[in-house]
Amino acid sequence: MADQAMTDQDQGAVTLYSGTAITDAKKNHPFSVKVGLAQVLRGGAIVEVSSVNQAKLAESAGACSVIVSDPVRSRGGVRRMPDPVLIKEVKRAVSVPVMARARVGHFVEAQILESLAVDYIDESEIISVADDDHFINKHNFRSPFICGCRDTGEALRRIREGAAMIRIQGDLTATGNIAETVKNVRSLMGEVRVLNNMDDDEVFTFAKKISAPYDLVAQTKQMGRVPVVQFASGGITTPADAALMMQLGCDGVFVGSEVFDGPDPFKKLRSIVQAVQHYNDPHVLAEMSSGLENAMESLNVRGDRIQDFGQGSV
């Protein structure tokens, strides 16, 4: 998959030295505006939808945003950006921010999405990859971009390219298996904790090791976190899953369209939204988890998952 870092030395690099605020020293730089727009979503759940009715239901359940997806998942084959007609219909139907996905490296799809005035563009490996060698230069767009990552190096390379929000990605198959998401979130958070205890020479060496821009690595050390909003994605299907991601240090969660399968999707979505907002209150989480025994009935975690446990590195 494409993983090429930008070579423009300082273009769009976030420079923040104000506690945990995510800002840009150049207040008139468009990137600071895009990062600020992404920060508005902190503490929320972003729900994948493939119809207007699903978008309305997600909004009524309290989703902070909806991400429009190609509804033909079941056909297999190449997945692309959603039909512009569907995007326009969703935008007319809801008042929450609307996101849409473009294939990795497909800057023309991104141009089309920006012309449709979507609020955010997700350059997504969840759909098909258009360019194996290049990511989109996100500084060329007015719209804030979201990019997936599985570790700190990937996250910082995507930020250097102009990503205003990071999606820590786990399972891509909509099976409801949260294990890979937990692994990747813990890996990223763990690397940041180790980074916090490094001296300047060690930071430089670490930046080379993970192939990340030194200035962003140093910035991450100072902040104690990656310098943009970070959401978790993949296998998050219950209130407990959502609360786990928040307690591990994420700013919010993506909820896949599989949440609409089975009975009472509104109740499931509402419970997940409440869990994100009250992730440290086990009494609220117990209440939100009650009566959801059918929430996972349409999801099939890979049967040999338990046998695999302990066989690989942790």
Curated annotation (Swiss-Prot):
Coiled coil: none
UniProt lineage: Eukaryota, Viridiplantae, Streptophyta, Embryophyta, Tracheophyta
Primary site of residence: cytoplasm
Source species of the chain: Arabidopsis thaliana (Mouse-ear cress)
Name this polypeptide is given: Pyridoxal 5'-phosphate synthase-like subunit PDX1.2
Example of a GO MF term: protein heterodimerization activity
Note, other: Unlike PDX1.1 or PDX1.3, PDX1.2 is unable to interact with PDX2 and restore prototrophy in yeast snz1 mutants.
Example of a GO biological process term: pyridoxal phosphate biosynthetic process
Entry comment describing in which tissues the protein is expressed: Expressed in callus tissues, flowers and roots. Weakly expressed in leaves and stems.
Domain of life: Eukaryota
GO terms under cellular component: cytosol
